[in-house]
């Protein structure tokens, strides 16, 4: 979710930086607005600040625990060493393989392959992740994969948090908002 030290009303420097650098790799970001994420982002930032976690932007060294923003699509480029956006979003499965005219069950199998690759990449960095990716025979609808996709997104963000704590991320943006990415994507 986009967050900033000030209310978000339009595209931020962080969004432009990510889209400029990673758009050619299929990882541009949508422009946030006052409506989306709107008050939710302000409340999230305020709630974390009340707990002692201020938003870390790229204008200063962070020496205390902080809230950071990350973008799973970009993180996956580094995690899986891919050149282009990983096709793992259930709602976009019709677009990913449009030219191939895949059936629903074929799209499910493709998504599950991507899910397994993502989990394998995460397993190299986070121990103890239980098996939660279903077998193709256990999936009857694409929408039933949404909770699995959400769990993967959460784990990807946790991995970026670990990378950030270890000093292996770079914030793209400015003093009001930064999206943190693995430094290997900037300084290979």
Question: Model segments located where?
Answer:
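RNase H-like (RuvC/DEDD) metal-dependent nuclease/polynucleotide-processing core
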Residues: 2-188
